[in-house]
């Protein structure tokens, strides 16, 4: 059963998807292009995400999903097109009729609005859980230590790890480390969260605890763009699913439409492969028991 959402889902599963929600736009991407050398990896992406919306991006490896997220945070500078987050430009500013790259100070301020979590946890191994979470609020936002600690404890409680604040990353499971990474991002009070395959490096038995934390964020109204291979999660939590292939958005729509009755053959072929792989993994797991 899909989550109850304040956003009204539209049933149109096409690349020209238009949401009927009246919520303000949080992320707007227009005609986004990105190349590595002569290889174009994003080919004119158009995407709008509204405040409080959960958008899941699926597609085969190499389709440009992770690059798209990195461009939204300008970890990967894009070649052309425009991105705005909460009405503010990402990466580039217009000056004297031209386009200039933001200064490092401007980029740091911009990135405070955009949380991003990767499949690698990237925690500082020599710092405790609490120290990992307070580092950016103190060093980047300039918060007082006491204020940063209060925020960190609130976010650790949010992901079910308040009791682990004095532990070191090496003392945590992979799922717990990933939840610390989520709490660390939330401590910066972002406008939008970008989550890039954050369960793919975890053992299967640890995936559920991370998905539960993401579900809680969705229920709390956090705007999220999620790259995932977890189709059940995409169905249950998303307001919209976007299918990408070969650097383009092939189609997008409500999860109960796109995941069960997609319009394009490329989408159908991808979903068939996912189902086949899931069945093989399930049979292998059963054989080991």
Language-model regions, residue ranges each:
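Catalytic Walker B motif of ABC-type/P-loop ATPase nucleotide-binding domains
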Residues: 193-196
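Conserved ABC ATPase signature
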Residues: 168-172, 176
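ABC ATPase "signature
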Residues: 252-253
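H-loop/switch region of ABC-family ATPase nucleotide-binding domains
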Residues: 228-229
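Short coil-to-helix segment of the ABC ATPase nucleotide-binding domain corresponding to the Q-loop/switch region
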Residues: 127-135
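A short, proline-enriched helix->beta-strand linker immediately N-terminal to the Walker B motif
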Residues: 187-191
């Amino acid at each position: 059963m899909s989550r109850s959402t304040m956003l009204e889902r539209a049933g149109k599963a096409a690349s020209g998807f238009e949401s009927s929600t009246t919520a303000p736009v949080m992320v707007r991407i227009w005609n986004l292009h990105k190349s590595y050398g002569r290889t174009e990896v994003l080919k004119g992406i158009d995407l709008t995400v509204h405040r409080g919306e959960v958008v899941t991006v699926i597609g085969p490896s190499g389709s440009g999903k992770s690059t798209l997220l990195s461009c939204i945070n300008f970890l990967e500078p894009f070649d052309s097109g425009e991105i705005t987050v909460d009405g503010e430009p990402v990466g580039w500013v217009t000056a004297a009729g031209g386009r200039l790259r933001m200064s490092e100070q401007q980029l740091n301020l911009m990135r405070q609005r955009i949380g991003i979590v990767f499949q690698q946890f990237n925690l500082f191994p020599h710092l405790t859980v609490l120290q990992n979470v307070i580092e950016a609020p103190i060093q980047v936002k300039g918060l007082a230590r006491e204020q940063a600690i209060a925020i960190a404890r609130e976010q650790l409680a949010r992901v079910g790890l308040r009791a682990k604040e004095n532990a070191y990353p090496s003392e945590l499971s992979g799922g717990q480390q990933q939840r610390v990474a989520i709490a660390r991002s939330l401590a910066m009070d972002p406008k939008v969260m970008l989550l890039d395959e954050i369960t793919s490096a975890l053992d299967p038995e640890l995936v559920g605890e991370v998905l539960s934390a993401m579900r809680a964020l969705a229920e709390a109204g956090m705007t999220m763009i999620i790259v995932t291979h977890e189709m059940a999660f995409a169905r249950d939590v998303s307001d919209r699913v976007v299918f990408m292939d070969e650097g383009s958005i092939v189609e997008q729509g409500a999860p109960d439409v796109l995941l069960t009755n997609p319009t394009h053959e490329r989408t159908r072929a991808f979903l068939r492969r996912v189902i086949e792989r899931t069945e093989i993994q399930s049979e292998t797991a059963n054989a080991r028991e």
